[in-house]
C-alpha cells in the first residue's frame, strides 16, 4: 500500500522567517497552493509568490490585533480531515484539504529573556493558533505534513522531488514527532515562566528564592549522541544537550578527530573545561575520574601543561586535558610524545596541532570556542524518585573578599597561591584538599570522608612524585571542624591555609594556625562538590 501523500495545498504562518521565502517559492514552483496569514503573507506576496490570505479563504477577518487568525473550522477541518473518511462532510462545508502546515511559534523565550520584559509583553507572545495548528497537523500525520523547523525545508523539497511531489508516512511521522517536541518545549517554557510567580499574581521577583524555582520543573534537551554504554558497560546511555546552549562547553564542542566520546569522557571533559575556565592566565587542567589531578599556570600553555603533568604523571595517564588557550603545535607534540590521553579540549586548535594529533587516531580532539562569561542556570542531580535542583556554583572570591584571621599575614606569593588553589579546590570532589606553590598543584586529596585523610593523601601524592610540600599553600573546600587538620598540615610543611571558615571551633582552628606560625585566610564561601 502506497502511504505517500501528495502536497497540493500548504498553510504557512511563521514567526521565525528564516528560509521561508525560498521554501515557499520552491513549493509554489511545484504547484502547491499557499495559504498564509499576517506578516508571513505580506512577505511572500512582496517576493512575488502567489498567496491566499487565510481570512479570504475562511471569509472571516483577522481580529483582536491578530489574536484570532487561524482558529476557524475551515482551517482546522482542512488539517484534521481524514482522507477517505471525512471527504463528504468537508465538501459539504466548503472545507479544502490542507496537506502541509508550516508553522513556528511566537518567540516567547526570546521575549521573556529581554531586560524589562513585563507580564503583558510575555502574555502577548503566548501563541494560541500556532500550537493548535501544529498539534492538529501532527495528530493527523497519516495524511498531513507538519514542518516546524527551518532546517527541514530542504529535506522536504528533496523528498517531494524524488517522490512525485509527495511525502512518505515515515517522513510525516518523523516531522510529527518533532512538532510535538516543539510544542512541549514551548508549553514548558511558559509554565516555567509563570511558575516563578506562584503564589501571587505579578512580575517575577528576581532574587526571590521562593519564586526562583517554578512549581513544576520543565526542561527539554535534544539527543546529540547514542553511546555504546554508560558509566558502566551494563548501562545504556545517550547524551542530550540544550536546544541553544550559549556558553562554550563540552555540549557545544566540535570533535575534530578521534573515537566517539564515551559517557565518562563527556563527564570528565566537562569537569576539566569548567575548571580551566576559572583562570585568566594560560592554564592547563588534567582530570581523571572527574577530579583534577594536575593544574598549573604558565607563560604559555606548553609550560602550563608541563607543570600540570608533573603533579601526578601516574593519574594523568588516560586522562582528559583542557586548556584555556589555542592548542598549538609545540604543546600537541609534548602531549602525544609523553603520555596516553583520552581527550584534549581547547577553545581552538591550530592547523599544525591538528596534523600532529592526527598521528594518534583514537585521541579525541575537541574545539569548544572562546568563552567570555558563564551563563546562569541550574544544576540538576537525580535522586530516586526526584530531582535536586540548584543554581550553578558560579561563586568565586577575589582578593578583596578574603579575610586574614591569623596573626601572621600571608606573603604576596602565598596570597597568589591561595587564590590559585582555591579555584582548583572548587572542582575537586569533597572532602577536597589542594596543596599548591608557584601556580602549580603539588598534591590533591579528593573524595575522602575525612578532611584530615584528604590532606594526608595530598601529601602522599606529592611525596610520591618528589614534590616539596614545605612552603606550600593548602586550600580546603569547606571549614575545618577541628584543629587536627591544621596540625597535620603544619607537620607537612604548609605555611598558609585558605578555607571558608564557619566552624563552631573556628577559634581553636585559628589558634592552631597561630601556634604553627601559619597564615590563615577565610573566604566566607564553601565549595562542596559531590
UniProtKB/Swiss-Prot annotation:
A GO molecular function held by the record: IMP cyclohydrolase activity
Stored InterPro entries: AICAR_Tfase_dup_dom_sf, Cytidine_deaminase-like, MGS-like_dom, MGS-like_dom_sf, PurH-like
Database matches in Pfam families: AICARFT_IMPCHas, MGS
MGS-like domain sequence ranges: 1-148
The EC number(s) this enzyme carries: 2.1.2.3, 3.5.4.10
Superkingdom as given in the UniProt entry: Bacteria
Keyword DNA repair found: no
The keyword Transferase appears for this protein: yes
GO cellular component, one term: cytosol
Catalyzed chemical reaction(s): (6R)-10-formyltetrahydrofolate + 5-amino-1-(5-phospho-beta-D-ribosyl)imidazole-4-carboxamide = 5-formamido-1-(5-phospho-D-ribosyl)imidazole-4-carboxamide + (6S)-5,6,7,8-tetrahydrofolate; IMP + H2O = 5-formamido-1-(5-phospho-D-ribosyl)imidazole-4-carboxamide
Pathway: Purine metabolism; IMP biosynthesis via de novo pathway; 5-formamido-1-(5-phospho-D-ribosyl)imidazole-4-carboxamide from 5-amino-1-(5-phospho-D-ribosyl)imidazole-4-carboxamide (10-formyl THF route): step 1/1; Purine metabolism; IMP biosynthesis via de novo pathway; IMP from 5-formamido-1-(5-phospho-D-ribosyl)imidazole-4-carboxamide: step 1/1
GO BP annotations listed: 'de novo' IMP biosynthetic process
PROSITE patterns: MGS
Keyword line: Hydrolase, Multifunctional enzyme, Purine biosynthesis, Transferase
Record remark on domains: The IMP cyclohydrolase activity resides in the N-terminal region.
Family in the record: Belongs to the PurH family.
Protein's name according to its UniProt entry: Bifunctional purine biosynthesis protein PurH
